Amino acid sequence: MTVHEAIRQSMRPSERRRNILKRLTQEPFASVQELQTLVGASEATIRRDLKRLAEDGALKRVHGGVERPEAQTSRLTGAPFSKSLHIRTPQKRAIAKAAAALVENGETIVIDGGSTTYMLCPFLAELDLQVLTNSLPIIDKLLASPRTRLLVPGGEVFREQNIILSPFDEDGTAECYASKMFMGAQALTSAGLLQADSILIRAERRLMERAEKLVVLVDSSKFSRRAGLVLCPLGEIDIVVTDSGIGAQDRAMLEGAGVKVVIADV
């Protein structure tokens, strides 16, 4: 056995999967046999890795191998950021202001990309903060605040949503610890917090693991939506900040799951 073969056979699962995905950034298709040679693993091991990556939406399994999903490499589902920014703007701004009141000076926080979370920025300008965010507009906005230290994950830029997402397990955020994560949602239902895309869900799960508490910012229209993929059950949410349009049944649903509800003044 050569030194290179020994190194390949000692790869951890995360390293194998990272190399598989890296190969798919270079070529649109890779056979199982090619990937076996690439990472020095058995066919059974490779197929387990491919099954996991396919379930996460990072690749598409086809006859004889895998290919990168074209829809994923070009765009995400859902309204572009520039359009979302101008929908229910008064409610989003009020929700962001109420959510910003939960932030304490000196904290490390995570802000997930989105039109409502973007509106947090002006309310945080006077605080000493360390902020981990995957949002290019949030990065741009907070760059003007010298009191904010910015951390950014590695990955690919999705231009319509203006966010950075990575299919890799190791995106540079593993050592970060935050007291709170602030994020929006496609919808909130009894099933939990829903988002539109599997790659978005995978990236957001990694960000959620970096934070002690999860704060969700949603306007009341999000409670009437039912489409999407479940990111997490309601029990994993600590606080929901919304507007007074939330119905009594939806509020009871959240509070029954142990979620604190904060109503913003619009």
Task: Give the role of each language-model region.
Residues G113-S115:
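Glycine-rich N-terminal segment of FAD-binding domains in flavoprotein oxidoreductases
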Residues T2-Q33, T37-A44, R48-V110, C121-E126, ...:
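HTH-adjacent hinge/linker in prokaryotic transcriptional regulators
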Residues T2-K22, F29-E34, G40-S42, A54-E55, ...:
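Conserved phosphate- and dinucleotide-binding cores of soluble alpha/beta proteins
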Residues Y118:
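Glycine-rich SAM-binding Motif I of class I
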